[in-house]
Amino acid sequence: MNAKEYLRQYEYATRRVYRLEKELEEEYLLIDSVRSLSDLDGLPHGTNVSRPVEDRAVRIVDKAAELYEARIEALELRQEVFETIMSIDKKDGLACDVLYERYIHLKPWNKVCETVCYTWPTVRIAWHRGLDLIELQINTRTYNES
C-alpha cells in the first residue's frame, strides 16, 4: 500500500458511513410506507402471510449495527492516519498541515491552499514531500513487522 492509499483509508471509511446512513434513512421511509399500506388494506391477516413491517424492522436493526461498526472503524482509521500525519510535523510542518487538511478534514485542494495560505504549486510540492515521508514510515513499519 502506498502513502496516498494509506491516507485515503479514512476518506473511504467516511464515505461508507455516509452511504450506510442514507440506506438506514431509506429503510425508515420504507417501513413507514409499508406500515401505512398494511393498515389500509382492511383484510384479515392469516398466520402464513409475510410480515413486511417486521421484516423491515429486522433490516433496520441490521443496518444500524453495520453503521455502528462502520463508525467505529472510521474513527479508528482517523486516529491512525492523524497520528501518522502528526509524526512528520517536526520534519516538515507545511507538509503536515497540507496532509492534515486534505486527509483529516477532507478538504478539496483549493480549500487546502486557502487554509495554509500558499499557492497550488507550493502546496503540491509540500504534499509530495509529505507523501514521501509517510511512504518512508509505512515502509519502515512494514520492515520492522516482518
Question: Where are the predicted features?
Answer:
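N-terminal interaction/assembly modules
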Residues: M1-S87, L136-S146
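Long, charged/polar, surface-exposed segments that mediate recognition or autoinhibition
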Residues: L99
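Short, well-structured alpha-helical interface segments that form or flank functional binding sites
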Residues: E5, R15, E76, L94, ...
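Short alpha-helical "recognition helix" segments of helix-turn-helix
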Residues: K111-V116
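DNA major-groove recognition helices of helix-turn-helix
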Residues: V123-Q137
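Short helix-coil-helix linker/hinge
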Residues: M86-C96
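Helix-turn-helix DNA-binding motif, specifically the short coil turn and the N-cap/start of the second
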Residues: T119
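Short helix-to-turn junction characteristic of helix-turn-helix DNA-binding domains
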Residues: R102-L106
